[in-house]
Design a protein with these regions (language model features):
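Non-heme di-metal
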Residues: 2-346
Length: 348
């Protein structure tokens, strides 16, 4: 057994946090959701549309990562908790895909962007292996978990937004806070808390940031409605979005802090803040008992002990450079695919 996670108690369980898979009954009507559903602002709406698509792809990858970790966890309670995380992520992707169909009906290049995002994640595994993928997922969960906490702390962000989308994002934020420690604890069981494990976490965060600074902005740029394309070059057009994400009360400021704290050898997300008060405040407002789903843990621990962590060295720098080059080439192809798709639509 590793890292003080006992056979019966996980850090989430110690705090009374139960990770519950849920399937909400949200419906998204393409005829009632306006194109500019986020306060009528094109830049902000487009950013959240791209985040929905990119997030859905990421969650599919997190599901695979969680399953990969479960195969290496010889602890039933921790394996169950990780499986609950996996189920939540799968349902998140499923619900967001319902909204994505509205975006497809609006003529946005959703499927092309999904394929692009999926390929970027695949490059990480092809070049650097699944432990690196899991480190990227770990960093992603810490970023998204803190993002969710900030949303729950500032619900006024969604004032004047379409109600179905407000419900979607607030429910999603709640569950991200609820399971924020789950992937971390599974990852730590498998990889440990050595100096090399810490370095792997940090490099995973570097991969995540390097990916996000290209993949999300290019998604925002290409998801703009045709009628607003000419406005994209004006800095003032982006000011509301920049203020929302990075201003004095920006939604991403806490996420940056969490990623920075991954440098700590003994990092744990619960050291950043106590999630109990905000979960207790929002649980009855954002979830319903009839949404809850149960499952049986089928198998776990069959590959325990097969993960060996090497020290980060020059070969890892080379892999990162190869990854960045692959991302740039795939981004060029993505832009070409979007242009071709829009030209075909225009000719139709």
């Amino acid at each position: 057994m590793k890292n003080n996670i006992s056979n019966t108690i996980t850090p989430s369980m110690e705090r009374g946090i139960k990770i519950i898979p849920r399937v909400p009954d949200f419906k998204f009507d393409k005829n009632s959701i306006p194109k500019l559903w986020f306060s009528g602002d094109t830049g902000i709406t487009t950013a959240w549309n791209a985040l929905s698509i990119m997030g859905g792809v990421a969650e599919i990858r997190f599901v695979k990562t969680g399953q990969w970790l479960i195969d290496r966890i010889n602890d039933e309670e921790l394996a169950k908790e990780t499986q609950s995380f996996v189920q939540q992520e799968a349902f998140h992707s499923m619900i967001h895909s319902k909204f994505d169909r509205v975006l497809i009906a609006q003529g946005l290049p959703v499927k092309i962007y999904q394929e692009y995002c999926s390929d970027i994640f695949s490059y990480i595994e092809e070049i650097s292996g699944h432990s690196m993928v899991s480190a990227v997922a770990l960093a992603g969960e810490q970023m998204i978990g803190e993002f969710g906490h900030t949303l729950l702390d500032n619900p006024e962000v969604f004032d004047n937004t379409s109600e179905p989308l407000r419900k979607l994002w607030m429910w999603h934020a709640f569950e991200e806070v609820e399971h924020q420690a789950a992937l971390h604890d599974a990852w730590t069981y498998v990889h440990g808390q050595s100096k090399d494990a810490r370095n792997l976490r940090v490099v995973g965060a570097v991969y995540l940031i390097a990916m996000l600074v290209i993949v999300w902005p290019i998604g925002i740029w290409t998801m703009h409605p045709k009628e607003s394309k000419h406005k994209r070059l004006a800095l003032k057009f982006w000011k509301p979005l920049i203020q929302q994400l990075f201003g004095s009360k920006g939604l991403m400021r806490g996420s940056g802090k969490n990623l920075w704290n991954l440098i700590r050898k003994d990092f744990h997300p619960f050291d950043m803040y106590d999630p109990i008060p905000i979960l207790n405040h929002w649980r009855s407002k954002l979830t319903k008992p009839e949404w809850e789903k149960s499952f049986k843990l089928k198998d776990y621990g069959k590959n325990e002990g097969d993960v060996k962590i090497s020290s980060i060295g020059l070969s890892d720098i080379n892999k990162f450079v190869r990854f960045q080059w692959a991302v740039l080439l795939r981004t060029k192809k993505f832009i070409s695919e979007v242009r071709s798709s829009r030209n075909n639509i225009a000719k139709a």
